[in-house]
């Protein structure tokens, strides 16, 4: 959806501009074309989902959800699951997401807020019972949390020491998440057709007004 705060964080973290993709505003074909155009000559494009994977319009429809966008762009999904305080119950939780995945787009799982010792136990158990790869975990880093306020996160430039914190977070995650495995998953993504003409959408204007509607 339309969001300006997340792109600011992306620019701060990886030093490149990111853009919004929204199947509600631009439809499936136009969204696919915009995705291909913005990807350019880069080897990989990373899409950050919003809300829950299947939460679309009104929170009750698939249209407009992160899953719908993945369908439109044929993007493999890495599902991040918050498992803090959970035991074996995380297996049926993941199984439920897989059963909803009619297009078989979920290709890997990352377990969030989990200890190294418990990960060593749960990873083989999950992979034994479910047809999915567990590609890593993120430890519960209590001293690292992004601040928030009404209507969302604070701006990245308002957070003291954000670059140092993100560097530390990156160093930690590269130890616990198999990035090479995620790259391999991305390399097997289906090929999309080349970009054709992108329809120019004029801004709406209120009746009798000369300025676009906001």
Protein language model features and the residues they cover:
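ATP-dependent carboxylate-amine ligase catalytic core
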Residues: 1-73, 81-108, 116-121
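Internal gly/pro-rich beta-alpha loop/helix module
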Residues: 87-207
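Short hydrophobic alpha-helical runs that function as membrane-insertion/retention elements
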Residues: 77-80, 135-137
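Nucleotide phosphate-binding/pyrophosphate-handling subdomain across enzymes
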Residues: 43-44, 208-210
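Phosphate-binding active sites in nucleotide-utilizing proteins
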Residues: 212-214
């Amino acid at each position: 959806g339309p969001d300006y705060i997340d792109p600011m964080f992306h620019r701060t973290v990886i030093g490149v501009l990111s853009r919004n993709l929204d199947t509600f505003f631009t439809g499936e074909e136009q969204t696919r074309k915009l995705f291909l155009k913005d990807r350019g000559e880069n080897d990989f494009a990373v899409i950050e989902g919003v809300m829950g994977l299947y939460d679309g319009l009104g929170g009750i429809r698939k249209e407009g959800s992160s899953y719908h966008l993945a369908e439109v762009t044929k993007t493999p999904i890495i599902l991040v699951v918050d498992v803090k305080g959970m035991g074996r119950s995380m297996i049926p939780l993941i199984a439920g997401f897989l059963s909803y995945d009619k297009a078989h787009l979920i290709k890997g799982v990352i377990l969030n807020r989990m200890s190294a010792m418990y990960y060593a136990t749960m990873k083989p158990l999950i992979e034994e019972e479910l047809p999915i790869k567990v590609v890593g975990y993120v430890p519960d880093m209590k001293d690292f949390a992004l601040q928030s306020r009404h209507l969302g996160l604070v701006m990245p430039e308002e957070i003291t020491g954000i670059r140092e914190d993100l560097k530390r977070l990156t160093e930690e995650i590269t130890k616990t998440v198999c990035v090479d495995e995620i790259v391999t998953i991305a390399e097997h993504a289906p090929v999309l057709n080349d970009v054709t003409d992108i329809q120019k959408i004029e801004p709406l204007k209120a009746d009798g007004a000369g300025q676009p509607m906001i």
